[in-house]
Amino acid sequence: MEFVADFETTSVRVYDPKTNKLDKLKSKAFVCAWAIIPVEINPDPEHIQKGRTIQSFLSYVNNLYREIGKHASGKHHPKLSIYTHNLKFDGDFILYEILKSGTAQLINEVRENVLYNFTIKFLDGSEVTFFDSMKIFPISAEKIGKMYGIKKLYGDWDYTKYRDESVEITSQEWGYVFHDVMIISKALADYRSRGYRENTQAAIAYNERLRRTYAKFNKLVAMRLKKNNYEGFRKAFPFDIMPLPFDLHKHLLMAYFGGISWLNPKYACVDLVDAHSYDVHSMYPDKMANFPLPVGQPVIIENPTLEEARRLIYNYDCVIVDVEDLSITLKDERHFPFLMFPTLGTKSIRMQGKIIDCKNEMAVLSNWDFKIMESEYNIHSMKITKVYLFRSKKGQYANFIHFFMEQKTAADKVRNDPNATPEEKQNAEVQRSIAKVMMNSSYGKDGTKLIRQCNSTIYNKDSDILEQQAKDEIAMPEYYLPSAIFICARARFQLFSAAILVRDDFIYSDTDSIKVTSEGNEILKNSPYFDVDPYRLGAWGYEGKYDTARFVRQKTYSYTQNDERHYTVCGAPESIKKSMKIDDFKPGMIITLEQIHEMGLEGRLLPVRVPGGVILEETGFQISTVDNWDEYNGRNMPIDFQLFRDIIKRKNANYK
């Protein structure tokens, strides 16, 4: 059975008098209220159970397992799954209690950079698995509630108020706690009613893609072979998407990287007037539906001549090459350093993560990235040692993408229909959200890493705080990596193809969008090679004009439209953005907590582990900068146009 739980917590904060920073060893946190409800399509407040301490919560969960077990049939052990909306936070209170007290064992934990789930086993053998509902719905409970039409119950919660068991929680405050569990309960029940059993967006979308593309393939049956018969597992897949052998998958992962986020140094921190923005309608779904993608296992060609390799690169859709002794430098400041393959820090110079210069490197490149390299870089030396030639199939996932594109389009019509009922509009919001998840989240599974740094949680008796122990885990391939490589490579090439149309008038790109000057906008509007349409899948859509704009770095810029200023700043909550002033908007800009509080706003909340669990500590914000940069030290160079141009000239001159 599945349930949804939520915790409200309180804390005792102790600050170091010398530094005024939180003393995490002397502070403490604990659960002061909890609520739990079954997953049900029409959540009933009468079904909610509540309590005040983490101990009472775990006791209730233990008893709940036993109660479910009474109704379990045959030899099957009961299954109890509990979802919380932000398990990284809530889970620490559970793990602290069981690891310190010994009331239960942590028998399984799936945690890489983030916590996905964990299973605990009580002393009587009861097992409970906790999942993070944010991995299914990565938005706030408030936004999910609006999507599902759940009205807010009476009540609110004052997070500045200290509450131990002696402090009564009012009915209005309990109403606030109940609200969140009811929202997630309904949303999760809705997903289950649609047949989505997986516990992350990516897994849901990937398995839906399999169901709609390879209806006769049952991956659950194949998974039974994985542990003891890996070759049998591989060959149970349809030929088109049979996972590559381990060594080949591990090697070709070096050809897989994401979208291009790049600020032209020429425009860094420059006050611009009349900039224009375009983005691609569903860039990645378009590549899945409308472009040739690889199928099956590759033909491997050893030690081809450069002429033979280039013939394959430019005449076939899906080719990967191994390149050795690679020394390249960007041609000049007008060209785009859109290569991101792994390099040694002592052999490469990078800006914004992109390669400006490298020497004697090894790379694994798709043919689309190879074309970018030949267009934008001076190649001083290069040897192609292997070519991996894949068969290709166009429209491999067209049925899957077009089905959900139609779902999204139909939902948009209802959302914009003035005659639609509130219930119809609510259903359309849910339908649209699911369609977007399906189209945009499935391909990433194919690029899953094999060697992953996993973290296990331990209790440190000396500090009375939870800690992480890192270890590498190796997994066998269970996805078809070449799909992810070429979906992303095709997407990068589309953005690159737009950028080279405008060259000097290119300002900024971020994965599926570009910003250009007014002169660049005129070039794009008149170019037969720039496909613009307000709706069509894969076409560029015009987002609008920025009256003024300032771009500081990747994912950090400000613009005005209709006399209203907007900030896009990665990692900054809305309260921080409201505190920003354009005169100070530059690398190294600091917004102190005092400045934020003067405006009546809340600072950025950072989790700090303390005895008992976690405290969310308010902090200010700083736009990062690059200090003490040296060539070939493995760090990015500053976004400085003069330095950028000088480095390129000097490095190219060294080879003449």
What are these regions (language model features)?
Residues V14-P17, I94-Y96:
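Short, solvent-exposed loop/turn and secondary-structure capping segments
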Residues D6-V14, L22:
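Ser/Thr-glycine-rich phosphate-binding loops at phosphate-binding pockets of nucleotides
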